[in-house]
Regions:
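Pyridoxal 5′-phosphate
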Residues: 1-188
Length: 188
């Protein structure tokens, strides 16, 4: 972080080693310096309860396909006061309230002012159903079950002599490991 830093963008849970980052503390630190925080929730939102109010992040993004939903749909959460200050780069159908001439364009209220054209209606409906399904199970239960499965798998993998587990103690269900004499990307 330098005096020129305007945005900190980071994953809440890394997809490589599975560490859960202290987002609340990072946001507090950043906000003291006037820095915005953008959180990648792709590996956290589908697997644990995430409360944007508690975290105090400025933006959080995640995708439907990692939550049992369709591809091509996602969410960008943003604090309302920040979203209201965003102006679209391009304009499209459904964004403008009135269009008197090219120099006088009045945009609709959020979220419509930032969403041009016909949305992926089927995808959004499918994503909504996926979210309902996961919420009916309960994100705490999902996280608890994933952690039990992780512990079980680590218990089995640790007994295999040619496997080296990199992140035995991580707080997510992501397990990173190496197989002796095999390039990691080939294993993946």
């Amino acid at each position: 972080v330098t005096p020129r830093t305007k945005i900190i963008s980071l994953a809440m849970v890394t997809n490589v080693i599975g560490d859960v980052r202290p987002i609340k503390e990072i946001c507090a630190f950043a906000h003291e310096l006037g820095i915005f925080v953008v959180v990648d929730g792709a590996q956290s939102v589908p697997h644990m309860k995430v409360d944007v109010s508690y975290l105090d992040c400025d933006f959080l993004a995640f995708s439907a396909h990692k939550m049992l939903g369709p591809t091509g749909v996602g969410v960008l959460y943003g604090k309302k006061e920040l979203l209201e200050n965003l102006n679209p780069i391009n304009l499209g159908g459904g964004m403008n309230e009135s269009f008197d001439n090219p120099k006088e364009i009045y945009l609709k209220d959020l979220p419509y002012r930032l969403e041009a054209g016909t949305p992926n209606i089927a995808g959004v409906i499918g994503f909504g159903e996926a979210i309902k399904y996961l919420n009916n199970i309960g994100m705490d239960k999902i996280h608890e079950r994933e952690m039990k499965l992780k512990d079980y798998l680590i218990d089995k993998m640790i007994k295999i002599p040619f496997i080296d587990i990199v992140n035995v103690e991580c707080d997510s269900a992501i397990i990173s490991f190496n197989v002796d004499d095999i390039f990691a990307q080939d294993v993946a």
